[in-house]
From Swiss-Prot:
Any Pfam family the entry gives: Hemerythrin
Subunit structure: Monomer.
Name of the protein in question: Bacteriohemerythrin
Binding site for Fe cation 1: H19, H56, E60, D120
Length: 133
C-alpha cells in the first residue's frame, strides 16, 4: 500500500496532512492484522482513529462551508455513514480483535483511497473552478 499525494490532495494543507495521518493509522491497523495485539494497544489505535477521523470530517465540512460547496449535505451524509460503519465494526467484533482490525483497516483504506479519489476530488474540482480562474 502506498500513499499517492496526487490522488488525495485537497489543495488544503490541513486536510492533506490529515489524510496522511489517517494513512499512517491505516498502516498501524494493517500491521496489527499480521500479529497478535492486546486490547490495550488496540484501544490506543482505535481512539486515535476515531479522534482523527472525526476531526478530519469536521475540518473538511468547515472547508466545504467556507467555499460554499453545493453538495455539502450529500458529502456530510457519506461521512456519517463511514463513522457508523466504523462504530458498528467496533461493537460487533469487540471479542475478535484480529477480525476487528482487519475490517477496520479495510474501511479506513477504502475511505483514504476510494472516498478521497471519488468524493473529495469533487470538492477539489469545485474549488479549482471557483477560485483558481
Amino acid at each position: 500500500m502506498t500513499y499517492n499525494e496526487k490522488i488525495i490532495s485537497m489543495n488544503n494543507d490541513l486536510l492533506d496532512h490529515q489524510h496522511k495521518e489517517l494513512f499512517e493509522i491505516s498502516k498501524k491497523l494493517s500491521l496489527m492484522n499480521q500479529r497478535h495485539v492486546g486490547t490495550k494497544e488496540l484501544k490506543i489505535v482505535l481512539r486515535e482513529l476515531l479522534i482523527m477521523i472525526n476531526r478530519h470530517f469536521s475540518d473538511e465540512e468547515a472547508f466545504m462551508r467556507e467555499i460554499e460547496y453545493p453538495y455539502i449535505n450529500h458529502h456530510t451524509r457519506i461521512h456519517r455513514k463511514i463513522i457508523l460503519e466504523i462504530e458498528e465494526i467496533i461493537i460487533s467484533e469487540a471479542k475478535f480483535v484480529n477480525i476487528m482490525t482487519e475490517k477496520l483497516n479495510l474501511v479506513v483504506q477504502d475511505f483514504i483511497f476510494k472516498h478521497t479519489a471519488k468524493e473529495d476530488s469533487k470538492i477539489v474540482k469545485y474549488y479549482e473552478e471557483k477560485f483558481k480562474k
